[in-house]
């Protein structure tokens, strides 16, 4: 289905960190295709700082929480904006409810049936059940309204953020190590990270530990285990400050988590570590910076990081030597 006249369009992508970042190519395509259109984005409060002030977004609609009361309150705001089209890039009940509350006459979503999201859509013909990258699925929403697919080089808005965090030591040749993930099976053990940090230090890099508040204890353990100095930024950066750090890094090493996708978005050379998640679906096929995938899981396409089999290959099974070799292959020389 192609739309002949796109005037006011709303993206609904409420969460999470990585999912919001992976929706940026859709935003870029919509703005390039419909330069005079009003583009809005509905996002959960926790992730709004990623998008606040973005030049391609005319209206940022912030959902305080996913409870029904805040959803209905946001609906008042969305109806006042008079959107013609809503693209539900989340595909869940709350995002579909937000789309419905906008009163937009055209509400386009995926062909899956999750949490009864389809009952609020006017069109659920966008294919999302095949084994392709999540960015590809999101871009299909843009296809449905005639948006062009443009090469995604980087998000210059996020890449322009300064590295404003206070760091001691040499800032050159920073190796950003994203030490956290939503579940332990998706990342390296603290001992493995400490070994990687020491090997990078010996190779002329300054290791920087990246993570949120939930990774603070893990980062402190890595720092204690490492034989050489590291810069510990866990729980010390906002989203925009993190963008600045990743933009200025010589290389990023990360498992499948939000910061991995942010590194891709700002054009940082990245080594992606996969095991219980599928790089076909969540790796990098959308950015243009150097990216090496190290996949302990082989060709398996039925991975479930929430229910990991006892014999499953996990990220911690990736040899340190392979990670370091990948780093040296793609790291850029910083001035």
State where each predicted segment sits.
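Catalytic machinery of carbohydrate-active enzymes
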Residues: 1-335
């Amino acid at each position: 289905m192609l739309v002949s006249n796109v005037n006011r369009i709303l993206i609904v992508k409420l969460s999470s960190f990585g999912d919001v970042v992976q929706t940026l190519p859709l935003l870029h395509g919509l703005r390039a295709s419909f330069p005079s259109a009003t583009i809005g984005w509905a996002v959960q409060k926790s992730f709004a700082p990623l998008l606040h002030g973005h030049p391609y977004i005319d209206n940022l609609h912030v959902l305080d929480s996913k409870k029904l009361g805040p959803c209905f309150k946001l609906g008042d705001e969305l109806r006042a904006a008079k959107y013609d089209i809503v693209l539900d890039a989340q595909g869940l009940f709350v995002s579909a409810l937000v789309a419905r509350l906008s009163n937009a006459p055209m509400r386009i979503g995926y062909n899956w049936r999750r949490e009864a999201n389809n009952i609020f859509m006017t069109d659920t013909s966008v294919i999302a059940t095949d084994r392709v990258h999540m960015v590809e699925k999101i871009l299909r929403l843009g296809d449905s309204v005639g948006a062009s697919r443009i090469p995604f080089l980087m998000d210059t808005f996020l890449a322009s953020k300064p590295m404003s965090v206070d760091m001691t030591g040499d800032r050159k040749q920073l190796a950003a190590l994203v030490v956290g993930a939503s579940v332990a099976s998706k990342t390296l053990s603290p001992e493995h990270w400490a070994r990687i940090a020491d090997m990078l230090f010996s190779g002329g890099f300054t290791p920087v530990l990246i993570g949120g508040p939930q990774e603070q204890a893990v980062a402190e353990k890595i720092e204690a285990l490492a034989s050489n100095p590291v810069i510990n930024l866990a729980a010390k950066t906002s989203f925009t400050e993190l963008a600045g750090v990743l933009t200025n890094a010589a290389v990023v090493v990360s498992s499948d988590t939000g910061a991995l996708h942010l590194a891709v978005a700002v054009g940082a050379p990245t080594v992606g570590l996969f095991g219980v998640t599928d790089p076909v679906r969540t790796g990098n096929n959308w950015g243009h910076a150097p990216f090496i995938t190290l996949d302990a899981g082989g060709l398996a396409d039925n991975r479930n990081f929430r229910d990991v089999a006892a014999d499953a290959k996990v990220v911690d099974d990736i040899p340190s030597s392979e990670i370091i070799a990948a780093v040296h292959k793609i790291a850029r020389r910083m001035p």
